[in-house]
Regions:
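Gly/serine-rich nucleotide phosphate-binding loop at the start of the catalytic core
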Residues: 33-44, 49
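Extreme N-terminal starter segment of soluble prokaryotic enzymes
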Residues: 27-31
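Glycine-rich phosphate- or other oxyanion-binding loops that anchor nucleotides, phosphorylated ligands
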Residues: 56, 60-286
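Short, Lys/Arg-enriched N-terminal segments with co-localized hydrophobic residues
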Residues: 15-26
Length: 286
């Protein structure tokens, strides 16, 4: 369990030790952040649990190929995302009931999930990789993503015939519902919007951890959506009871939204099947 700062010890232990022609190689440790269980579900379906013989089983630790994965479901909104990232990356203690984490600094952070398209050139279900993420506040700097990790991710997807567009994203505390909202955000230079990436990238940068964002476009500027902003609490997180009321008052729009989200996530799942076991996250080893 993480208590305080991330341990600096990067010794080789357990399943992270492999010998190849006399060389000792360490598995890459990747923290994968998702806002909801639905968005994190592909990771659990693709990866496997701790291998047999692991003497230190850890709740939430998965394996895919030569990568050790920890799925962190942080919740909707920038405040929850920031708090969960600070916990996971060791800046604040984990609650006693929370998951324990590997006792070493991750090699990379990967943020996954849905995003909204701000440009008509981005169709629904398009996979996107962020180059940078902008804040809403003009007094904050953009957060760049790892060029090395992002390039590897995009190259692997293209090599398997899957289109992945490099984009600038922006993180908003509110859901961009109307076309006018999305066009206003597009003036920043961003092509997609989400509610969590900027805060997680900022914490990862503070921790000195390479980070990338891989999302899928769930809606476009012309999409007609239910007003889920009415279901957000003061912290920008989704209130389940209020969300139910929105669903009851806009049943057709909500059904279309859920169907579209499910379809988009199926496309992202195909991308993650290629990325999670791949050698994309070794920037910190070089």
């Amino acid at each position: 369990m993480v208590q305080g700062g991330i341990p600096g010890d990067r010794a080789l232990t357990g399943e992270s030790r492999e010998s190849v022609e006399g060389l000792v190689l360490r598995m890459s440790l990747v923290y994968i952040f998702a806002a909801s269980k639905m968005e994190g579900q592909p990771v659990e379906q693709i990866a496997v649990g701790n291998p047999e013989g692991d003497s230190t089983p850890r709740l939430g630790t998965l394996r895919s190929g030569d990568n050790e994965l920890v799925l962190v479901v942080g919740g909707w909104g920038h405040k929850k995302a920031a708090a969960k990232a600070r916990e996971a990356l060791g800046f604040t203690p984990f609650p006693s009931e929370s998951q324990s984490l590997p006792g070493r600094k991750p090699d990379a952070v990967l943020i996954i999930g849905l995003c909204g398209g701000l440009s008509s050139s981005l169709p629904q279900n398009r996979i996107v990789a962020y180059t940078d993420c902008l804040p809403i506040e003009s007094n904050k700097p953009p957060q760049p993503c790892s060029v090395t990790v992002t390039n590897k991710v995009v190259e692997i997807l293209y090599s398997h015939g899957m289109t992945c567009e490099r984009v600038v994203g922006i993180t908003s505390p509110r859901i961009a519902i109307r076309r006018d909202d999305k066009l206003a955000l597009a003036k920043s230079g961003a092509k997609v919007v989400d509610m969590e990436s900027y805060e997680i990238l900022a914490v990862a940068a503070q921790a000195g951890v390479s980070a990338a964002v891989l999302r899928v476009v769930a809606d476009t500027p012309d999409s007609i959506m239910p007003d889920l902003n009415r279901a957000l609490n003061q912290d920008g997180a989704l209130d389940d009871r209020k969300a139910l009321w929105v669903a009851l008052t806009s049943p057709i729009r909500m059904a279309r939204l859920l169907s579209g989200n499910k379809r988009a996530m199926s496309h992202l799942a195909k991308a993650l099947e290629l990325i999670l076991p791949a050698d994309c996250f070794t920037e910190a080893h070089n």
